[in-house]
Swiss-Prot record:
Its EC number is 3.4.-.-. A motif (JAMM motif) lies at residues 139-152. GO terms for biological process: cell cycle switching; gonad development; oogenesis; protein deneddylation; proteolysis; regulation of cell cycle; regulation of oogenesis; reproductive process. The gene is csn-5. Belongs to the peptidase M67A family. CSN5 subfamily. It comes from Caenorhabditis elegans. The JAMM motif is essential for the protease activity of the CSN complex resulting in deneddylation of cullins. It constitutes the catalytic center of the complex. Its cofactor is a divalent metal cation. It is found in: Cytoplasm; Nucleus. It holds the Pfam family JAB. GO terms for cellular component: A band; COP9 signalosome; cytoplasm; nucleus. Keywords: Cytoplasm, Developmental protein, Differentiation, Hydrolase, Metal-binding, Metalloprotease, Nucleus, Oogenesis, Protease, Signalosome, Zinc. This is COP9 signalosome complex subunit 5. InterPro entries: CSN5_C (IPR040961), JAMM/MPN+_dom (IPR000555), JAMM_MPN+_peptidase_M67A (IPR050242), MPN (IPR037518).
Length: 368
């Protein structure tokens, strides 16, 4: 059942976040059966069926920890490990912990320090009586979606070979901030030499033009798992404590300002894709591929427009709220030097100002 019976201590934003991400309230999922886990690991059913694992269930605490970690990383990739267990055809993720790694905008490198930290942390968990095993890893793709790159595929394949069962999670913190819902995906790679059957086309996701080639080359070497989220009444206090630090940063920031570079990159990417589609249609205006590519660009543009409008509304609401609080809380026009509506209207000329001439060089790059 979905989270409807929430404790009074939960704030309204926290309840909205849980419902937006469809967090379910389940207590029995936390029960650990050691005998069952040993039997499953000894049987190794995933060796016989490359598509054995079909879904992953993530606790709300683990989800919030990963989201906060990825958000702190900003434009740099981050990495951490997943703790949990397996149950039939599912991974159950109960907790996560971050790794001290060296990240760039396109990759993350785990050095000796990270491996040492990983070993010590796991040993401390065993000492404290925590029975959950490390069953996978997570990392971020800032601004370019949830999928596995060539390096990710190699890393996941290696881990599945020597540390099964193992799963990979990818989070996009920039798209999460823009959309308001956690952008997340979970993946497993196929064994070497295995050719997957032609499946039904998956749901379209926007991939930057610079990443499309990497995405296309490796997209048949892995598959995605259905992702769901859960929580229990026992971890409500921990979730509330985490949320108290999460909502402050969310409330004090705006995607219109914190995601300026990401939004500009999205607009430039759409411009480049339109230039490529225009060339394709000029050669053959009845090209099916050209029209399909055009519809995908339209989908991307609509998504960017929706994110901008959502960010604008959120920003105006915060201005109205805090201008009223600063004026003494009565909400009257005389309460402050400028009424909330005056402040909101004052921001419009800034938004209507001349936009940067970023599309021009993007067209030249596409023509080149």
């Amino acid at each position: 059942m979905e989270v409807d019976n929430v404790k009074p201590s939960s704030s309204v934003p926290q309840r909205n976040w849980e419902k937006e991400n469809n967090v379910q309230n389940v207590d029995s999922i936390f029960e650990y059966n050691n005998k069952q886990q040993v039997e499953i690991r000894n049987a190794k059913p995933w060796d016989k069926d490359p598509h054995y694992f079909k879904q992953i269930k993530i606790s709300a605490i683990a989800l919030l920890k990963m989201t906060m970690h990825a958000k702190r990383g900003g434009n740099l990739e981050i990495m951490g490990l997943l703790q949990g267990r397996i149950d039939a055809n599912s991974f159950i993720i109960l907790d996560v912990f971050a790794l001290p790694v060296e990240g760039t905008e396109t990759r993350v490198n785990a050095q000796a320090q990270a491996y040492e930290y990983m070993t010590v942390y796991s040993e401390m968990c065993d000492t404290e009586g925590r029975k959950e095993k490390v069953v996978g890893w997570y990392h971020s793709h800032p601004g370019y979606g949830c999928w596995l790159s060539g390096i990710d595929v190699s890393t996941q394949t290696l881990n599945q070979k020597f540390q099964e069962p193992w799963v990979a999670i990818v989070i996009d913190p920039l798209r999460t901030m823009s959309a308001g819902k956690v952008d997340i995906g979970a993946f497993r790679t196929y064994p070497e030499g295995y050719r997957p059957p032609d499946d039904v086309p998956s749901e379209y996701q926007s991939i930057p033009l610079a990443k499309i080639e990497d995405f296309g080359v490796h997209c048949k070497r892995y598959y995605s798992l259905d992702v769901s989220f859960f929580k229990s009444q026992l971890d409500a206090h921990i979730l509330t404590s985490l949320w108290n630090s999460y909502w402050i940063s969310t409330l004090s920031s705006s995607p219109l300002f914190s995601n300026v570079e990401f939004l500009n990159n999205q607009i430039q990417d759409i411009n480049q894709k339109l230039s490529a589609v225009d060339k394709k249609l000029q050669l053959n205006d009845r090209s099916v591929d050209g029209h399909e590519a055009l519809m995908k660009v339209v989908t991307d543009a609509k998504a960017v427009g929706d994110e901008l409008e959502t960010g604008r509304i959120s920003h105006l609401v915060k201005q109205l709220l805090f201008a009223r609080q600063a004026g003494g809380g009565c909400g009257c026009s005389h309460a402050s030097a400028g009424s909330p509506m005056d402040i909101a209207v004052a921001t419009e000329p800034e938004k209507a100002g001349p936009s940067p001439s970023a599309p021009e060089p993007a067209v030249e790059m596409a023509d080149a």
